[in-house]
Amino acid sequence: DSDNERDMIAFLLSDEANNFKRWKNEFKELFLGDRILMIYVSAIVNYSRANDIDLMILRKKERHSKVNGVIAEKQKVLPKKIHLIELSQDEFLKNLEEKQKSIINIVKTAIILYGQSKYVELIKNVKSI
């Protein structure tokens, strides 16, 4: 049954995120209700060699004013620059449909720190990337 499959995928994504507790704890303030928070590329592979910390937030509606404040505070204490992409869920899906390479690469490499069930629900109808 597809609900069980989606639940299993969300569980596996959550389990994978638990391998990155440092980042989950560091950025938990950015998880605001209906959001999906991802970290991707070099910070998860080899932080010491990373140039920056790449994050993506997917939101249902408008931007939340708290996000910029949280990023500014984190930037004061983290030695690497934070590179944030914030998209609505519709913008994200449109980028996937248009086969935007940068978004596809994020999907392939990202760790879903928060919002795993929402992420699975969001991408369930994507045909191919």
Model-derived features with residue positions:
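Catalytic core of pol beta-like nucleotidyltransferases
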Residues: 1-35, 45-50, 59-129
